[in-house]
Amino acid sequence: MNMYQLLERTAQTYPDNLYLVREGVKYKDFIDLVKARAASLDKAGVKKGDVVGILSHNIPEFPISLFAIWYLGGTVLLLDTNLTPFEYDNMAQITECKLVCAEKAFVYKTDKFEFYDITKKDGKVNPDLKPAAVESLDIATMSFTSGSTGMPKVVPLTHFNIVECTNSLESMAEWIRPADILYGFLPMYHVFGFAVEILATLHFGAGVLLQPSINPKEIMADFKIFRPQVIPAVPRLWEVFRNKIIDNVKAQKKWWLVSFVLKYGKTLQKIGLGALVRKVQKPILDVFGGRARLLIAGGAATKPEVETFYERLGLTFIQGYGLTETVGPICISKPTKKRLPFAFGGPTLNNECEIRDKNEDGVGVLWLRGHQVFGGYLNNEEANKEIFDERGFFNTGDMVSMDKNGELHFAGRKKQVIVLDSGKNVYPDELEGMFITIPGVKNVAVFEHRVKDKTVTYGVFSVEDGMTIEQLGAEIANANKKVASYKWVTHFAMTTEDLPLTSTQKVKHHVVRQNLINGMYPDRHE
């Protein structure tokens, strides 16, 4: 089965379910829009085997063009909207992409490829244009994972990989139902947004409410009007939502009551005070529209206190793990009473894992094998030899451990692990998760750095206006007491500027480190 056939199956099963919620487009109508776009692209010269780029925010024409390209048997090059013309030109050359479906705001003069206006109105469906004969092992998408200049890594994913990922999402059937509304503000060019906004909706016959903006006012208005049942977001956004909710409650001088009810809600319900619990929860749940059932986090580890906050509101909170190389979610947690903080579950259907080279703490490198794992980077045999073993297992480069329940825990990227002069390993994610709870700290990057010919664990902190280097130092010293002394951060810099982030709100550690070297963070304690 290929991806267009999967769309056809969903449209036949749920023809009258809304797919594009804001636009009121049902699955049966979406099929016609795809066929009309396919006819337009066919006239533009797109044929089976061609690589066609999509450069767009989350607008309806994105999924319409996506499936239209697949209808014609093409490969979709998913392009990050935050790059430069030079990078797009290079990407097109590497992948032999000759046409890019783009919003007008991204169009520029180039001789590397042609632009196609993604918002252009399509004509009628061409009844003579049939779906291309696409095999399951044909390449469906390409994405860049390590930059677009120098020696980039391009991830080709087959229709088989993506269909299998879609099928594996059945593990979420307890929480996602046909006709649910899934909020879609994660960029669809990124594998997390692609997996939940395209694949999950397709599998369950659910609808997606696309939102091209990350403006909080627009998002809150959407929650109020459309009342989505499923909301995916990166952990950083879940933390921002939580903090704003708490600040609003404190401003009303009601935090003492809310915090008490959230902490003892189950006990209060058992003694007949369920009405009080619901009364306290309701205005908070109304922030998300009042119908939210499932919150999904991915792209990084979620702090336990953030996850606990939402679960005490009666919401189901799921943590997933995945990479571009695995079509996103290849591990999904299941919320149970036994589940430990930071757990992101185990491999999904038809996938398996091994943890190799464990240290004394049980932390080792995660290797994966299965139907969702890609076949190797495009035209990069050297890299492929390094990441695949003779048994077909893929080296993720991520450090994980397994708890007593058999669930995995993220410890950090192997390439970001700090190796001290003593030989001890320090995992930045562990320390960042600890430091981010310091009042006044907006974000933090921990990495390896040389100070006076010594390898140290260095931290760069983004803080609120008014915090002094002395105050921050005292908070860091207090936090350090929670971990072994060799992990302590005693060298750090402070800035009131935001740290550079990726499109999925992850800190760009390499950029922060280079900024430090370039003297951009003068407030230092070394």
What role is predicted for each listed range?
Residues 100, 370, 375-376, 399-485:
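AMP-binding/adenylate-forming catalytic core of the ANL superfamily
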Residues 231, 276-408, 414-417, 431, ...:
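Conserved AMP-binding/adenylate-forming
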Residues 418, 445-450, 477-526:
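Conserved C-terminal "lid"/linker of ANL adenylate-forming enzymes
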Residues 163-181, 191-283:
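Conserved AMP-binding/adenylation subdomain of ANL enzymes
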Residues 20, 44, 64-67, 71-135, ...:
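Structural core segment of the AMP-binding/adenylate-forming
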Residues 126-144, 151, 175-181:
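Conserved pre-ATP/AMP-binding loop-to-beta segment of ANL
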Residues 26-28, 140-166:
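Conserved AMP-binding A3 loop
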Residues 16-45, 50-59, 67, 84-89, ...:
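Conserved AMP-binding/adenylate-forming core of the ANL superfamily
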